[in-house]
Amino acid sequence: MMVQDLLKIKKNEYYTMKNIVIAAEYATRLGELTKNFPKPLLKIGNSTILGRILDDIDKIDDIDEHVIITNHKFAPIFEDWTKEQNYSKKITIIDDGTSTNDTRLGAVCDLLYALDKLNINDDILVVAADNLLFFSFSEFVDFAKSKATSCIMCHEEPSIEKLQRTGVIVVDDNMH
């Protein structure tokens, strides 16, 4: 290996990361609104929930592909949506084969299914597609690269009502 090749590696020119978007939920709590339409593709202003997420992540140089894992019921809708998009990174839709909320795989199994199906060995950014976010993932990706280990993003939520509807972690004083 030449010195210039080592410098390229040091500058992360060979570093790649896949963005895996978990979009296989059935959003049953939203009733008729999402009975036959995926929650991540609901309109928010001039975009969609998923569109807002990808607009941000697509700008991260280290990301080389967006992998969207969805269910069989909504896969054709995601495929059609993808054809209308103009992101700089490739978008791959993965159908997890489930057709009902009762047969869903769950987020972790969907992630494992996508990793196995595409034989992904790169670092990954895993994002839930059903959350409206108001921040950029760029700093988080830089942080994860600098730590060279698994990183989990979380935020403090003071509302007990909101905490009762979501996953909760408990941390000690050593959390960084």
Roles of regions detected by a PLM:
Residues 5-8, 34, 116:
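Compositionally biased amphipathic helical and low-complexity segments enriched in hydrophobic
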Residues 9-10, 57, 121:
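Low-complexity, intrinsically disordered/propeptide-like segments
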Residues 76-173:
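Conserved beta-loop-beta/alpha segment of the NTase-like Rossmann-fold superfamily
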